[in-house]
Amino acid sequence: MRIVSTVEELRSALPMDQTIGFVPTMGYLHEGHMSLVENARRENDVVVMSIFVNPTQFGPNEDLDRYPRDFERDEKLAREAGVDVLFYPTTETMYPLDMARVTVRHGADVLCGASRPGHFDGVLTIVSKLFNLVQPTRAYFGLKDAQQVALIEGYVRDYFVPVEIRRCPIIREETGLAKSSRNVYLSDIETVEASRIFSALTMAREALDAGQQVDEVKRQLIERLDEIPNSQIDYVELVDYPTLGAVSSDSTELLLAVAIQFERARLIDNVIWKKG
């Protein structure tokens, strides 16, 4: 595995005539990231991973400074997973002038974007920069961040970016808790209680399967999540996927998405329901 940190080093490490699978991350790798690498490894000649904690997607009162970082650990995991090129740039490398940024016009003011203004502008700005640098054949994103995946797919279509976006399933603990770098902030008791999030989402999906109306499913989902102690609901939403718009009679896929705030960790999770 080759570790590079500058644009020049990255460009010299990229192959000219082979397919590239790209896995962008913010580090503190876990099994969810490893599953993305596994998919990339299976479908491409070369696998490139980036590790960069992107400052422009954090708000002024968010956890940028305390976001978990352990490059030595990440390097070991990336190497063991079969990553060929690990790109580990500085903020100065990724934002040399910070003259221009991507602005998201639709879908960024709902779900996570409702309480994190500017977040997805930062996400798509860094994704745009990384796509320009790596020029991957395929890029791999986990559906735990389903809103992010939908917006990246829209960006790729709008800007005619020649990359295939691969949606990858959520990797979970045995309890159902979605794997996340922020799980490290949970206490032992909170870790147990947080597993109830997926249980509530699963029951909501089953209610849709049984033909219950969207409003009633949402009401029941809120009730179940409200029962989780020492937590606060940030949002509970059912939206059309991948448009992220209101559910209509034409909707064939629905995203059931939630965000729950514990003392030191804000967790997101979701399930996708398909009609028929």
UniProtKB/Swiss-Prot annotation:
**Pathway given in the UniProt record:** Cofactor biosynthesis; (R)-pantothenate biosynthesis; (R)-pantothenate from (R)-pantoate and beta-alanine: step 1/1
**Which residues hold (R)-pantoate?**
57, 148
Give the enzyme class. ligase
Primary place of residence? cytoplasm
Q: Which UniProt keywords apply?
A: ATP-binding, Cytoplasm, Ligase, Nucleotide-binding, Pantothenate biosynthesis
Molecular function terms, GO-annotated: ATP binding; pantoate-beta-alanine ligase activity
Subcellular locations according to the entry: Cytoplasm
Q: Single Gene Ontology BP term?
A: pantothenate biosynthetic process
Q: What's an example GO cellular component term for this entry?
A: cytosol
Which residues of the sequence carry a binding annotation for beta-alanine?
Answer: 57
Q: Where does ATP bind?
A: 26-33, 142-145, 171, 179-182
* Catalytic function, reaction form: (R)-pantoate + beta-alanine + ATP = (R)-pantothenate + AMP + diphosphate + H(+)
Q: Does the keyword Transferase apply?
A: no
EC number(s): the record gives: 6.3.2.1
User: Where are the active-site residues found?
Assistant: 33
Q: What else is known?
A: The reaction proceeds by a bi uni uni bi ping pong mechanism.
How does this protein assemble?
Homodimer.
Q: Which family does it belong to?
A: Belongs to the pantothenate synthetase family.
Explain the purpose of this protein. Answer: Catalyzes the condensation of pantoate with beta-alanine in an ATP-dependent reaction via a pantoyl-adenylate intermediate.
Q: What is this protein called?
A: Pantothenate synthetase
Name the source organism.
Exiguobacterium sp. (strain ATCC BAA-1283 / AT1b)
What gene codes for this chain? panC
